[in-house]
Regions:
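Conserved SAM/AdoMet-binding glycine-rich loop
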Residues: 1-60
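Cysteine-centered iron-sulfur cluster-binding motifs in ferredoxin-type domains/subunits
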Residues: 9, 191, 245
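Solvent-exposed, flexible loop/coil residues
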Residues: 15, 72, 103, 191, ...
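Radical SAM enzyme [4Fe-4S]-AdoMet core and its adjacent flexible, acidic
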Residues: 21-22, 26-28, 48, 52-59, ...
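Short, surface-exposed loop and linker segments with low hydrophobicity and enrichment for Pro/Ser/Thr
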Residues: 32-37, 160-165, 243-246
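Flexible mid-to-C-terminal extensions adjoining Fe-S/redox cofactors in radical SAM and related proteins
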Residues: 182-184, 201-248
Length: 248
């Protein structure tokens, strides 16, 4: 039903248009997550596929974003891209912020900016992932970050849109995660969604080491399945109709 093409940076691939063309034959909605740096390639993609979704990663206002992303001018470039896509008539556009120790206050301003621009805004908390070889991410100024998430939730609940209310609940889940508590909703990785990496290995999500299928070989890996998938996960193949990455 939904495909999210992510990275790294998807737009460094020269065959990305071919991938999108194939995916649109399989799914009604394709969204590409990007830093927004390769503006010419992104605009070209939107011209060819007007129904494409674009989500740009923005980690704060101008200086904060550029510092965290390590590229001077990346905030301005991302904003110009989003405004250009909006002028082109692309509907499925927005940006997201991964909240860390350094940018939770800017998250609130980014939300307000999204309201003014009429664009989607999403949040995440930075975390560790086997797939990306990261194990030292930890939010240490928890009171400050949680306080800013509470402010965001209050703003979302003022909106008349049920979608904003669901996002408020999602952000409540992020607060729960930051506090180190068990997740509020069951993990559906490997059942309602899964992650395919460039070499064809299929993971329940990109946060787990266990992979359970390889598309080119069309055979299961003989690794123990993640506990919540049960012993039959290796023999049933990828869940039908699920193509988006996600998970814990």
């Amino acid at each position: 039903k939904f495909v999210n093409i992510t990275g790294g940076e998807p737009f460094v691939r020269r065959d990305l248009e071919d991938i999108v063309e194939v995916m649109f034959k399989k799914s009604d909605r394709i969204v590409i997550s990007t830093s927004g740096w390769h503006t010419d390639r992104i605009i070209k993609m939107a011209e060819k596929f007007p129904n494409i979704g674009i989500r740009v990663s923005i980690e704060g206002l101008s200086q904060k974003n550029d510092d965290l992303r390590g590229r001077e001018g990346s905030f301005d470039r991302a904003m110009r891209l989003l405004l250009t896509l909006k002028e082109m008539g692309v509907k499925d556009i927005g940006y997201g912020c991964t909240v860390s120790n350094k940018n939770s206050e800017d998250m609130l301003w980014l939300y307000k900016l999204s309201r003014e621009l009429g664009m989607e805004f999403a949040t995440a908390a930075f975390h560790n992932s086997y797939y990306f070889h990261k194990d030292d991410n930890e939010i240490t100024n928890k009171d400050e970050v949680i306080g800013n998430f509470h402010k965001l939730i209050e703003e979302l609940l003022k909106d008349n849109s049920p979608k904003s209310w669901y996002r408020a609940f999602f952000n409540l889940g992020l607060i729960n995660y930051i506090r180190g508590n068990p997740r509020m909703l069951p993990c559906e990785a490997g059942t309602a969604n899964f992650f395919i990496e460039p070499y064809g290995d299929v993971f329940p999500c990109n946060g787990l080491e266990e992979r359970y299928w390889n598309l080119p070989r069309c055979q299961p890996h003989r690794y123990p399945p993640p506990p919540h998938l049960g012993p039959s996960a290796l023999c049933r193949g990828p869940p039908a109709g699920s193509r988006r990455s996600g998970g814990c």
